[in-house]
Amino acid sequence: MASFYTSVERTAADILYVGYEGNRRVVEKVRFQPTLFIPTRNKSNYRTLDGVNVDTIQPGSMMDCRDFIRENEATNFRIYGNRDYIAQYISDRFPDGCEPDMSLVNVMFIDIEVQSDQGFPEPSLAQQPITAITVKSSNDDTFYTWGIGGFSPEISIVQDTRIEYKRCMDEHSLLKSFVSHYHNNIPDIVSGWNSEEFDMPYIVNRIARVLGEDQLRKLSLFGHKPELNKEGTMYKITGTTQLDFMKLFKKLGYTYGNQESYKLDNIANVVLGEKKLDYSEYSSLAALYRENHQKFIDYNIRDTQLVERMEEKTGFIALALTLAHKANSNYITSFGSVKIWDTYIYNVLRRRNIVISQPDPVHGDRRIEGAYVKQPLTGMHDWVCSFDLNSLYPHLIMQYNMSPETIADSVMPGVDVETLLTKNKFDVPKDHCLSSTGQLFRTDTHGIFPQIVEELYNERSVTKKKALSAMQDLEKISKDDIHQRFQVEKKISLYNNQQMAVKILMNSLYGAMSNKWFRYYDIRMAEAITISGQLTIRWAEQRINKYLNELLKTGNVDYVLAIDTDSLYVRLGDLVSKVMPDETDQDKICKFIDKVASQKIEPLLADAYEELKEYVNAYEQKMVMAREIIASRVVFTGKKRYIANVLNNEGVQYSSPKLKVTGIESVRSSTPQVCRQLIEKTLKLILNEDEFAVQAFIKQARDKFKGLPVEDVAFPRGVNNLWKKQKEGIGVPIHVRAARKYNHMVKEKNLNNKYETIQNGDKIKFTYLKMPNPAKQNVIAFPIILPNEFDLVRFVDYDMQFDKSYLEPIKNILDAIDWNVEKQNTLEDFFG
């Protein structure tokens, strides 16, 4: 029987609990009495992480606990235990954790439309009427929509949907009907696109203005009014969690890469290959509302549908829930690292009868030295192979037994990465290991942090095997057996979410440990991780260079052309030339390099890391370095900036080479999409053709570029500090200046009813203009389209746009390999 929580909050005296027992939703107000701990000389089952013997005490209610702590800490009497009483209550109720059943969780997707003929509708003011609302719950197959004009679901252009439309006389009746529906179907989770900072605060503020504040109580399972956050931008509705899908995408959608824009239209296209409903035949959304209400409502429904479909494909909401339940914490903590790790560690320690202490105040806030990034050997290199350390920071924690209770008080003087690389002899004390800062860690006991990381790794390995087994089972089930396939697919989804949750949790551990607000923050441990990481990667560099110099009988050649944190790039062109001087078959060369990597370099590195373990007296050897890519050609232009023509990646041989791009403008969200595409094509030419082919393509690209709409060639940017008082031209970012000019021209030409003005936080585009022009400046911005009424299209400086967005990044690469962007005239050309 499923038993799990969906929301746990508190008032001064009560815990407000929402969850499920079996198929039944449970809503409870609990008078909770927390447990604290105090030092004792008596025999006890409890101790702190640093060995203090403690025993339980229950002063009474949460308010009583607060008073008890204040009175006793004033006399320097130490009190232990978790003062986050929500976390303590969840742990009391679910000591062994719990798993969410997504078939029970009610997720409501929501989207609203607001009258926008007088500029952008500011949620905090909510001055303009709401003109449409659509909601779709995960436990109901119907889209419920409210509007003030005509709409026929039968002829809706939004396909594959069941729509129930409520036509209302006015906004008052619309909001009243919506509140009634919401009250009868209060969700566990509300989600939408930017719903946390727009849709929900606008709805709350508008209901208060139109229906009265008392109606807001109907939005909460506990009858509470929504609470505004400190910044005045978002509301908390007691009993319901808001998981804004835009924020989820930014947090969890890293596999989709950097985005030109985080507007729904772009992200839906990236994830689904689908877009918002196009209404470009109308001048604005306000015009669409006035002139085609049927399509206006379709537009509203479509937005809601897109977010729901993205969740169906990505499972980000399900993943956020799995991640939170992994730590026994509320869903909103899945967005961060400090809180979720604090709660996770608390639950692990609690199961071992280890009591947490209060964090000591942090004095000072000096910057932690980071990872090692080598200045690369710039230029073009043939036959490059990269090697990657597996999850470096978590494995360093395990290898050096780094944990709050294993940090030794002593530091060995004269220890740094350089001295360790020379293999100077250090007398490491017995039962200690030496980190690269000189900080010692005890090895006579297994640290809690390394234990936690190891358990997570083992758990993820088991879960991945379960997922693989379930996938194999699915292949054996007939496609006609829909019920059985559904059950197995549900298992696969569960296992995938579980293993991804563990991966995300592990990857966020160092982020928490290096944060001064983390309960277990200690700069000695945080810096020992990063600097020991520096030694680890440079240890590999040293060993690889020694091997290749001996093999190729070269003096002191640097074959490691680049290093970035946990990976290094080795140039093997000289080795290929020596062993296979006449070979032109790339597949054969690739197989040779793969053999060298797997049979020579990887075993060499394994031995090197075993030697390092003995040298620093590490708790255990956890460093594993494996071959990643084999590229026929690589061009480095600087740190973290390169392109590679990849033939094989982690053992997967590609049928045709794949382009890998890091740090180059083609993967930057600030580069226009059309230029990113042009840059990508050019990069492939650089890696596979010659200088003349690249020059011909650049010339052709410039000609085509000049025929594109301005909306395609303008720079995408996010705009902030729009209203910051700065003298024009002095310290004002160019895109902000462009946005101000756009707003000025909209007002100057009385176009407010047709075009929305740009607001702080908006994603915009801007372009250079030739002077003179009607705008009287050299740049103009716009949210979606450049208004024809501005009469500026004919002044767009296409040459400037082309040079800045396409040619300059390409020229940086060509300069690194001594190629020119256009053919250079020679004496032979001059004399014919």
Region spans (language model):
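DnaQ-like (DEDDh/DEDDy) 3′-5′ exonuclease domain used for proofreading
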Residues: 1-186, 301-325, 332-373, 377-381, ...
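Active-site-proximal helix-loop-helix substrate-binding element of RNase H-like nuclease domains
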Residues: 143-145, 152-156, 162-165, 169, ...
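Glycine- and acidic
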Residues: 159-165, 184-189, 288-295, 326, ...
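Proline-aspartate-enriched helix->loop->beta-strand connector
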Residues: 178-202
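Active-site palm subdomain of RNA-directed nucleic acid polymerases
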Residues: 276, 537-565
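Common nucleic-acid-contacting/processivity interface regions adjacent to the catalytic cores
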Residues: 283-404, 409-410, 479-539, 543, ...
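Catalytic palm subdomain of template-directed nucleic-acid polymerases
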Residues: 568-599
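C-terminal, non-catalytic extensions of nucleic-acid polymerases
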Residues: 594, 598, 602-832
